[in-house]
Amino acid sequence: MKKSLLSALTLLAVGSGVSSCSKGAQDAPRTGDLSAETELTAPLSGSLQTDSLALVDLFNSLGGMNWSNSNYWASEQPLSKWYGVQVTKVAGEPRVTALYLGANNLKGSIPASIGQLTALRTLQLQYNHEISGSIPEELFQLTRLNSLRLRFTNLTGELPAAIGQLKEIDTLDLSNSRYDLSQWWNGDPKTAREHRDNLYTLSGKLPREIGQLTKARYIDLSFQSFTGDLPAELGNLSALRYLSIYGCQFTGGLPAELGKLQRLEYLSAGLNELSKPLPAELGNLSNLRELLVSYNKIEGQIPASLGRLKKLKNLNLEHNQLSGSIPAELASLEGLYQIYLNDNQLSGQIPADFGGAQQNNLLWVDLRNNQLTGSIPARIKRTLPEAEKYAAIQGIPSYGYTIFVLSGNKLTGSIPAEYLAYPKTLKHLVPQQEGYGFTNGPK
């Protein structure tokens, strides 16, 4: 079979055809597609014939005869008709510029010959959970790659320093999360870590050369076995908007250099082994919408600088070892929809303005299982329609008014009348710690 393929493919450099590929509906948007004609300032090695040979090797190495869709592979049809293959003119010559083979039952190891696809801009092999072995070093020689998606494969080994060669990368998805977390999540950190540990494939330290991916806007490394400190060079990713390292084993703390990422909108670092205090520089992330650092071992106080994150919608710091008082500055976050500070060691009183008139979008405030003292602020109010839309999209419980979850603290005094008018809220106020409680309402 391989010999006949090679014979057929020698004709394809002449009769290639240039068109968009046939791709499955499961593939992600083509963020890295090239236009029909792209002029390059640097010389480009290879040809359509070398691309053809590389595709043959890919087909054989990844069990092509058993793919879910292998239309026109192993045929004399132009490469542009092969399922998932996109051929585009590059500097006037037809070349393979994209492979869309996600969720296609690929099995085996990625061959080193993939490095011969020197014009490749998009490589999507995600959701092929029987792709195994390490990521070949040659893949990182594809310096024109714009989109690399290897999500939920069974790749192993460490990321090499050569990852820094992908200087054109916009989307890097190496995550290993195919599961609906709600199926096994019960709020217990031990259970969460046990399930996390069963998902690991990639390992080792994150190379500091990742900081050379200065055009990257989306990086997802979640649920991999990465360890050690996060490299300070992450602060060089000036175009980054989305960063997830959720469910890894990183230690140390979030680098202060992350505060330089002015375009960052989403930062997820939950379920790691982070312990150092949160850096005040996080308050410089002026476009941040979600800050998720739950289920770590972070000590120290919540930085007051987080009150400068005016676009923040979701703040989740639950299940850490945070201490000190809740910064009053958090009451100035007018766009906040939900905040989770539960299961820490926070003390002092709930800030008087927390959940006040400025925070009309606030749906959910979880402060349970801390060491908070004093009385409950009278802050029950109707939420705005925009908040209800957000709740529906995010799957957040919504009652049409702000919910405070305050059980497991040291609160005293009387329950404000505003709470008594909304009986559904009362179950979230009790019980308090032994020896504490309220003079009215449920016990």
What are these regions (language model features)?
Residues 15-50:
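Bacterial Sec-dependent N-terminal signal peptides
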Residues 60-109, 178-205, 440:
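LRR flanking "cap" motifs
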Residues 93, 116-119, 128, 140-145, ...:
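Leucine-rich repeat
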Residues 99-101, 123-125, 145-150, 169-174, ...:
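Conserved hydrophobic beta-strand positions in leucine-rich repeat
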Residues 104, 128-129, 153, 177, ...:
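Consensus "Asn ladder" position of solenoid repeat domains
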Residues 110-112, 132-137, 156-161, 183-185, ...:
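The feature encodes a structural signal of leucine-rich repeats
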Residues 176-203, 356-361, 382-401:
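Intrinsically disordered, low-complexity Ser/Thr- and acidic-rich flexible linkers and loops
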Residues 361-365, 373-443:
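Leucine-rich solenoid repeat scaffolds
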